[in-house]
């Protein structure tokens, strides 16, 4: 039902080491040196330690000596919030070259006896480099609903707990609405869009979103069958695969 065939679980690696590897590959792809990065943001809910922040640890490993660093915690939406934050900093003129990383070791937060979560989540990291460019525009639509917070929780020193049905209903209702809002602002129709890049939660959610939007499923790339739900890492992992193809 989930569409997940396999997942990847860390053994020797950590959230920091995966994030650093993803960062190095992103910089290589962008043909940039680490010292050119002036802001480094890591989105994660599975840091190795509380302090120092994961972004500072990544900075140390990749030698991004000029980067300001901080972490961001927004769970599965984390990469998008980090991306939007990076874009806002670039638009303000404060920073020009920003490295955004989504990295998770969710296996450390999973109760392997709880089938509502243990069959879904995996470990991974992905990264993108954003650069200031003349004439580029970007429109974001973001919303939050704290009243739904109990649908997915993780107490300190405990495991993730999820109300799968509530998460499904919320995603299928709100994701199409946000997409419609973005398209309306940009005067676009679904047929104008090549791909809709969604968080890779599970296949049922992606299929339900496509159905509600009345858009063919081929416009919704998926790699969740290979990685499972990697929270903050899922969108940059998918973007990287599509970029390499």
Residue ranges and their predicted role:
Residues 1-12, 113-173, 177:
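Condensing-enzyme catalytic core mediating Claisen C-C bond formation in acyl metabolism
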Residues 29, 33-65:
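Anion-binding (especially nucleotide phosphate/pyrophosphate-binding) glycine-rich loop
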Residues 38-42, 68, 97-104:
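A short, small-residue-rich loop immediately preceding and capping a beta-strand
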Residues 49-63, 99-106, 150, 154, ...:
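Acidic-glycine-rich active-site phosphate/pyrophosphate-binding loop
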Residues 49-51, 78-81, 106-110, 146-148:
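Short, well-ordered, mixed-charge alpha-helical segments that flank or form enzyme active sites
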Residues 83-144, 238-245:
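Conserved beta-strand-centric core segments of catalytic alpha/beta enzyme folds
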């Amino acid at each position: 039902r989930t569409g997940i065939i396999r997942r990847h679980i860390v053994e020797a690696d950590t959230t920091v080491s995966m994030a650093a590897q993803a960062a190095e590959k992103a910089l290589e792809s962008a043909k940039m040196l680490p010292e050119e990065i002036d802001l480094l943001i890591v989105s994660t809910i599975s840091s190795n330690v509380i302090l120092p922040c994961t972004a500072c640890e990544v900075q140390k490993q990749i030698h991004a000596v000029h980067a300001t660093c901080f972490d961001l915690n927004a769970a599965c939406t984390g990469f998008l919030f980090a991306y939007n934050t990076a874009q806002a900093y670039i638009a303000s003129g404060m920073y020009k070259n920003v490295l955004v990383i989504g990295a998770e070791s969710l296996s450390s937060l999973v109760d392997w006896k709880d089938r509502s979560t243990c069959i879904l989540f995996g470990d991974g990291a992905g990264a993108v480099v954003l650069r200031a460019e003349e004439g580029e525009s970007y429109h974001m639509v973001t919303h939050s609903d704290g009243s739904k917070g109990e649908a997915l929780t993780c107490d300190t020193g405990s495991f993730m707990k999820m109300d799968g049905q509530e998460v499904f209903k919320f995603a299928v209702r709100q994701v199409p609405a946000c997409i419609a809002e973005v398209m309306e602002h940009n005067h676009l129709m679904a047929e104008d869009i090549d791909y809709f890049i969604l968080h890779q939660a599970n296949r049922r959610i992606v299929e339900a979103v496509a159905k509600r939007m009345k858009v063919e499923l081929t416009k919704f790339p998926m790699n969740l069958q290979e990685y499972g739900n990697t929270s903050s890492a899922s969108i940059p992992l998918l973007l990287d695969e599509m970029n390499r193809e």
